[in-house]
Amino acid sequence: METDPANSSSKSPAVVSEKDVLIPEPSENTVGVVQDPVSAEREAHEDSISTEASVAKVDDTQMPASSTGSEPLSKTDDIVPCPPGSSPRESPPSIFSSSGLSSWAKSFKFQQQDPNRTDSGMSAFTRFTSELGLHLPTKGSEEVGDSRSSNTQVGGAFESLTKAVVDSSRGAVKAMQVKARHIVSQNKRRYQEGEFDLDMTYITENIIAMGFPAGDISSGLFGFFEGLYRNHMEEVIKFFETHHKDKYKVYNLCSERLYDASRFEGKVASFPFDDHNCPPIQLIPSFCQSAYTWLKEDIQNVVVVHCKAGMARTGLMICCLLLYLKFFPTAEEAIDYYNQKRCLDGKALVLPSQIRYVKYYERVQNQFDGKVPPERRCMLRGFRLINCPYWIRPAITISNHTDILFSTKKHQKTKDLGPEDFWIKAPKKGVVVFAIPGEAGLTELAGDFKIHFQDSDGDFYCWLNTTLTDNRTMLKGSDFDGFDKRKLPAPGFHVEIVMIEPDNSQPTKSKSDSTQQQSQSSSSADSSKLKSNEKDDDVFSDSDGEEEGNSQSYSTNEKTASSMHTTSKPHQINEPPKRDDPSANRSVTSSSSSGHYNPIPNNSLAVSDIKAIAADASVFSFGDEEEDYESD
């Protein structure tokens, strides 16, 4: 009897092999990648149904053959799949069960939608992925990203461009500074080692000469901007802190520029005097003693001397220090050594007055045991210009370190006269003299004094010291500061400076009284002869038309001189009145028939009066009228 297939299938359970059982294992891909909340929920439901069916099949295979399918299928919800080889009770609940999916879904915490958020227009999937930390590109985000990236690129390009411009500007400024500093330093030797390039020279291992350390606001606004082309303060400090830390002391010689001494930790000493000038003679031994005291404290100590350029004033004081320390026996050797060390061409200390003061200090060392002798007081009598061409007729100013002692522009008798009027031709050819008639001298001097000749072709001047200078001093043109800068030549030009003691009206005469009287009696004849000679010599005449234009004045001068020398009772002015004499206020006296002096008021002197008085050789007599002057 044939059985019905339908009945047989309902009566006998279906046999399911292990191959037919599909037990999916959880993986990272299964957990992490979720496409959409709706689709994810649908897939979870389908997986749950398939899992229940699979469990049911497994359960049927494990049931005995005699069992029937009378138990309801709803009990399969409590069955949890487990891996093969393990008991169902020991395995944890699977995430693919309903309870596992519920707990897995609860682990996600979604924030509430903020209506004010800018991403409210985003899709649900985009918001979901953003909550999971998966920033997937969208059209809006691409636009925002493009704008941000473009802004970033523009900002980066601008920043790079700005940095390049700043770097190039700094490089250009640095190059300009280096160029300017080399131009300003000119022929001076520079210290160029390692990272340093400074206007600085080691004269010895312990004596350094350098330019002014500028660039600090404490030295004033001009000193601050000088840092662009001079040694910069920061670089100088860095150099000494690197090479001579706690072993250096700075000596500032500038009177026109100071700075905060604390920048050098207070190790700064100031010995100021003006540029292109000489110091008070007492300042030199004080400087040398201070430097020596610092050097002997430690063998590694160094002294750093500077003025503005670090050449002339610095050279004067360093050369004197070399003499003080017995490096050299003579001033010439010390000056030559310093010049070779400081400058490439050996022209550092070149001003004649400053060289003269180094020689003064040599005399102080050798003759006065290093101590400056007391100041000698004397009277400046006048000047004589020898081999003087007509184009040299300077105004005169006498001064010291604090005051102006005499000036032809301010003196009562000369302030209204031009230089060509108060410089008087002497009987000797090419000689002009200057003195104040009727006065003991131009001014009283003591110690250092400066003679400044102000001429249209260029000023020239010199510094002297009464204690270390003779009463009669002859200086060549090359002995004056600034004379070499004049355009017009003056070969053989000399200046004789005549000083007298305060208690004497005239210096000691080199000729006898009889010779002097003979010279005075022949002054009118010499004056007449000089007149005829000067007509043929344009070099020593004031102008081409002077002789003709002033012939009447010369005639008056000769007559006045003759009358002053041929009276029956001559009252020649061999000596000007002393200052303590009541007649000191008289400018000049003349002869009269009664033999008495008639004073001429000071304010009555005119150009013709000065020239008339100048014809009398005794007024401008320095005691050597017979002396001849030869051109060098």
UniProtKB/Swiss-Prot annotation:
Active-site residues, as the UniProt record annotates them: 307
Alphabetical list of InterPro entries matching this protein: Dual-spec_lipid-protein_phosph, Prot-tyrosine_phosphatase-like, PTEN2A/B_C2, PTP_PTEN, Tensin_C2-dom, Tensin_phosphatase, Tyr_Pase_AS, Tyr_Pase_dom
| Limits of the Phosphatase tensin-type domain | 189-368
Give the UniProt tissue specificity note. Expressed, at low levels, in seedlings, roots, stems, leaves, flowers and siliques. However, at protein level, not observed in older leaves, flowers and siliques.
GO terms classed as biological process = lipid metabolic process; response to osmotic stress; response to salt stress
User: Which stretches does UniProt call biased (Low complexity)?
Assistant: 87-98, 505-527, 584-594
EC identifiers of the protein: 3.1.3.48, 3.1.3.67
- Which PROSITE patterns does the annotation name? C2_TENSIN (PS51182), PPASE_TENSIN (PS51181), TYR_PHOSPHATASE_1 (PS00383), TYR_PHOSPHATASE_2 (PS50056)
Which residue intervals are annotated with compositional bias (Polar residues) in the record? 1-12, 63-73, 550-571
Cited Gene3D superfamilies: Protein tyrosine phosphatase superfamily
Q: Where are the annotated coiled coils located?
A: none
Q: Which GO terms describe its molecular function?
A: phosphatidylinositol phosphate phosphatase activity; phosphatidylinositol-3,4,5-trisphosphate 3-phosphatase activity; protein tyrosine phosphatase activity
List residues of the C2 tensin-type domain: 375-502
Induction entry: Accumulates in response to salt (e.g. NaCl) and osmotic stresses (e.g. mannitol).
* Compositionally biased tracts (Basic and acidic residues): 39-48
Q: Which intervals of the chain are annotated as region Disordered?
A: 1-98, 504-603
Alphabetically list the UniProt keywords.
Hydrolase, Lipid metabolism, Phospholipid metabolism, Phosphoprotein, Protein phosphatase
According to the UniProt record, list the residues that bear Phosphoserine.
Answer: 541
Which catalytic reaction applies to this protein?
O-phospho-L-tyrosyl-[protein] + H2O = L-tyrosyl-[protein] + phosphate; a 1,2-diacyl-sn-glycero-3-phospho-(1D-myo-inositol-3,4,5-trisphosphate) + H2O = a 1,2-diacyl-sn-glycero-3-phospho-(1D-myo-inositol-4,5-bisphosphate) + phosphate
Instruction: Cite the CDD domains for this sequence.
Output: PTP_PTEN
Please state which protein family the record places this protein in.
Belongs to the PTEN phosphatase protein family.
Q: Which PANTHER family match?
A: PHOSPHATASE WITH HOMOLOGY TO TENSIN (PTHR12305), PHOSPHATIDYLINOSITOL 3,4,5-TRISPHOSPHATE 3-PHOSPHATASE AND PROTEIN-TYROSINE-PHOSPHATASE PTEN2B (PTHR12305:SF87)
Q: What does this protein do?
A: Protein tyrosine phosphatase that also exhibits a weak lipid phosphatase activity towards PtdIns(3)P.
Q: What name does this protein carry?
A: Phosphatidylinositol 3,4,5-trisphosphate 3-phosphatase and protein-tyrosine-phosphatase PTEN2B
Lineage, uppermost ranks: Eukaryota, Viridiplantae, Streptophyta, Embryophyta, Tracheophyta
Q: Which gene encodes it?
A: PTEN2B
